[in-house]
């Protein structure tokens, strides 16, 4: 080979191989890289990425540690938090145990969450997944229909989990799926109907195999299955399913059962008001869910039943002020970005909580109430340079006009973060 040809011969800048020794050589600004080096780099990056995202279930947190973490984000619901902590701990302990090839194989126990709207069902499931660092997906049962009808197939629930796991199937197979509004797929009548119930009993039947544990075929693009498309295979045996719903009306079923079983001179007399405080749901039996419209096989796939209490005024006030991401703290931060101090007095917090109770929205409705109160002032504050402090009182819920305090000197100054002092929520929030 001539010296001129040697100069023209291109080489990989990393391994030194010439373009004749590799399949492809890609040029950059003054450098070249061959296909072999690209493949090697890709393997190194993928290995490091897998190490970063691997679900570590060997150092499983204990139930007390799980509950302590839940306490930071979820106010009240002590019984529910304890039950969930134990259930989740046992679920992932079971996964570790079944890899040891013991004679006894532990079966999966999915969870059914019952509680009023805005009591914290979704938040509990989200917080659990965040703490355990596992993939998490939320699905809405009202969008699901039986295969072959307009709507979503049940396999689309698993697609959301796979997507949230960055298409890492092994990681997704140890995730958590929360199916909301599960009470909406109850069959329309307690008795089996001769007409097809495609969004009720049909969906329950379709969910059975996934809940129990099966290798499901998931269409990668979602939507309906087509015979000629490729599917993602995922084993649902180790996926924890948490199904939640308000189950409006099940309290009447429980009340009828307990009333008929507590007749006579020795019967315990309890007022309806006392039963409404959350004690009624704790008496729920599988037969009550059957009468509500869940089929026996579906009830059997959800052996752990956790009930949540209806939030009272005290609990709602704590939700407004105590969690790490409490609403009051969020709005204070928003105003602080405009160099304005925001203060909610105790009467205002009570009024907001009472309004949420009147609307029957629970904690979910708190943001809407505050947003409605603060809309006008949040519109005006950026333009009013003389306002240094905003105080929200009880009247503000109706008038939408909080008390405004002018800044010293007629112009507000940047707010400096306070150090060493903690404001008491009991005095002002």
UniProtKB/Swiss-Prot annotation:
Q: Does the keyword DNA repair apply?
A: no
In this chain the ClpX-type ZB domain maps to 1-53
What is the stated purpose of this protein?
A: ATP-dependent specificity component of the Clp protease. It directs the protease to specific substrates. Can perform chaperone functions in the absence of ClpP.
Q: Which GO molecular function annotation, any one, does this entry have?
A: unfolded protein binding
Region: Disordered, residue numbers: 408-429
- Gene Ontology annotations for the cellular component aspect, listed alphabetically: HslUV protease complex
Query: Where does the record place Basic residues bias?
Result: 413-423
Organism ancestry: Bacteria, Bacillati, Bacillota, Clostridia, Eubacteriales
Q: Which NCBIfam families is this protein grouped with?
A: clpX (TIGR00382), PRK05342.1 (NF003745)
Keyword ATP-binding, does the record have it?
yes
The Gene Ontology biological process terms listed for this entry are: cell division; proteolysis involved in protein catabolic process
* Entry keywords, A to Z: ATP-binding, Chaperone, Metal-binding, Nucleotide-binding, Zinc
- The organism named in the record is Clostridium botulinum (strain Loch Maree / Type A3)
**Positions bound to Zn(2+):** 12, 15, 34, 37
Which protein are we looking at?
ATP-dependent Clp protease ATP-binding subunit ClpX
PROSITE patterns recorded: CLPX_ZB (PS51902)
Binding partners and assembly: Component of the ClpX-ClpP complex. Forms a hexameric ring that, in the presence of ATP, binds to fourteen ClpP subunits assembled into a disk-like structure with a central cavity, resembling the structure of eukaryotic proteasomes.
Chain sites annotated for binding ATP: 116-123
Q: Which Pfam families match?
A: AAA_2 (PF07724), ClpB_D2-small (PF10431), zf-C4_ClpX (PF06689)
User: Gene3D superfamilies from the entry?
Assistant: 1.10.8.60, ClpX chaperone, C4-type zinc finger domain, P-loop containing nucleotide triphosphate hydrolases
Recorded superkingdom: Bacteria
Similarity field: Belongs to the ClpX chaperone family.
